[in-house]
A protein has these predicted regions:
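Metallocofactor- and cofactor-centric catalytic cores in central/energy metabolism, strongly enriched
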Residues: 1-408, 415-418, 423-494
Length: 494
């Protein structure tokens, strides 16, 4: 039976339309009849009782904003009659609320074991320019090197970016660290680092950011030192292909998987279907000893105390407070309003305030304890749920997840996007209409919730799908040949 509306939490003052509802529709919610006094679009909210001006509006069991006026039962609730209730910097206190997950049966996937013990889910050759001046050269090399994509050489990809020179301070450090992280990513069976020669982030400097690397698989070329950098690079790619082609997939325990979690183009159903399904997936993977990473810090604002209270100890709580407040200070340093969110697309889909968006966004974290807090560019160390410092921008955040060690990124969306990151990026739709309309973008559909599919079923099905991707199944963006990256920029350009 098709479910037409949902009250998410017993304390909620609103319900969410799971399909378009017409004015005059009588909704029976917890034994109470609510007659809609206006049309309600899919993903949008309506009042379950009269709400007074300045009264908090409750959804997910938490306030998502404040009524700007008296709101009548059955009314549409959105930006016209509610506003954010959030302030700037806050003082937080630790109220430990940790739920340990019971271990579950082991599962395996077919991956690549690297010489340093790390695990990859792809066996690709990556071309990484140190500086934006080399982007076109790198792209030309990639295009001409496609003849080497065969057998166990799964792809040859270039990751271009506009940085590597004319940068100072944190920006320069961020660029170097992200490039170093990608150079050492286990999804790359081989890497050509392509430098110009005179840039700030030149190859000699970058080598200081690398750990012990396999010299048979990581090669360097400085273009200013070669008469024909393209032909010489193609020779290096040919040698790398000979090495990479010898790699074989083997059975690996799922406890070694690291999965990034991100949302973008969210709608009013994202926090009800897709994000909770990813949260269930995260708990399932962690119960098997695996690791997940949650980022997009600005979209934690308004829901941060939930994550803080799930920190395993007070030291992690303090790190999470710094994670949140440092990002708020970043906004303030640029004279930007901290809560200038959600986007026009979010609002069209039914998300009204940042609290509304954040409480839906953090559903991806499931119920597991927070075991680690990572700075931008820092690789994950602790198995379990980790928080990562990165902005909400889709490509910047997804690249940060990959740089921190994610083998795969799970990306939920209610509006849709074709983008790809350096690692397989699984697009998960919150509604079936998007899945039907954009099958060339979307890999997994959570819209079945409206048709009666349970969240547990969706999470279990998603887990099986992720194991298949980890074992080599290509996602839609890979089939289209899409790979991309972006680096977080904060400062001046010389």
């Amino acid at each position: 039976m098709v479910q037409k509306y949902i009250k998410i939490h017993s304390d909620d003052l609103v319900a969410v339309a799971l399909c378009p509802l017409e004015k005059g529709t009588v909704c029976n919610v917890d034994g109470q009849e609510v007659t809609l006094i206006e049309d309600i679009a899919q993903g949008h909210k309506f009042a379950l009782k009269d709400i007074k001006k300045d009264q908090p509006i409750i959804k997910y069991g938490y306030p998502i904003g404040i009524a700007k006026e008296d709101i009548q039962q059955g009314s549409w609730i959105h930006t016209h009659n509610m506003k954010t209730g959030l302030n700037d910097l806050l003082t937080y206190s630790y109220h430990r609320n940790v739920q340990e997950l019971e271990p579950s049966e082991k599962r395996t996937f077919m991956g690549y074991r690297r010489k340093n013990g790390k695990v990859g889910v792809r066996n690709e050759i990556w071309i990484i320019p140190t500086v934006g001046c080399m982007n076109n050269v790198a792209t030309s090399i990639e295009r001409q090197a496609q003849k080497y994509v065969k057998g166990n050489v799964e792809a040859i990809c270039t990751f271009t970016h506009p940085y590597g020179c004319s940068q100072m301070g944190d920006d320069q450090e961020n660029t170097r660290q992200i490039l170093a992280d990608l150079i050492q990513h286990p999804n790359a069976g081989g890497v050509l680092v392509l430098g110009l020669g005179c840039e700030n982030s030149n190859i000699d400097v970058l080598k200081n950011y690398l750990n012990d690397y396999d010299s048979d698989r990581v090669k360097f070329l400085v273009a200013q030192e070669h008469e024909d950098e393209i032909q010489d690079s193609l020779g290096i790619i040919a040698d790398l292909a000979d090495v990479v082609s010898q790699d074989k997939r083997e059975e690996i325990d799922a406890s070694e998987l690291i999965i990034g979690m991100k949302c973008g183009g969210s709608d009013g159903l994202s926090g009800i279907s897709a994000n909770p399904a990813v949260g269930g997936f995260s708990d399932l993977l962690i119960s098997k000893g695996g690791t997940t990473i949650l980022t997009e810090v600005p979209e934690m604002f308004g829901a941060e105390t939930i994550l803080m209270d799930r920190c395993e100890n007070e030291a992690l709580f303090n790190e999470t407070v710094d994670l949140i407040n440092n990002f708020k200070e970043y906004f303030k340093s640029h004279n930007q309003t901290i809560y200038e969110n959600p986007s026009p697309g979010n609002k069209k889909g039914g998300i009204s305030t940042l609290e509304d968006k954040s409480l839906g966004c953090t559903q991806k974290s499931g119920k597991a304890p927070v075991v680690g807090v990572l700075q931008y560019g820092q690789c994950v160390k602790n198995k379990g749920l980790n928080l990562l410092s990165a902005p909400g921008n889709d490509l910047v955040a997804a690249t940060a997840l990959a740089a921190s060690g994610a083998h795969i990124v799970l990306f939920t969306t209610g509006r849709g996007t074709p983008f790809a990151s350096p690692v397989p990026t699984v697009k998960i739709s919150s509604n079936s209409r998007l899945y039907s309309n954009k099958k060339n973008w979307i890999d997994f559909n959570c819209g079945g919730l409206v048709e009666g599919v349970s969240l547990d079923t969706l999470s279990n099905d998603l887990f099986e799908y992720v194991l298949s991707v980890a074992s080599g199944k290509k996602v839609k963006s890979e089939e289209a040949g899409f790979h991309d990256m972006a680096i977080f920029k904060q400062g001046v350009t010389l």
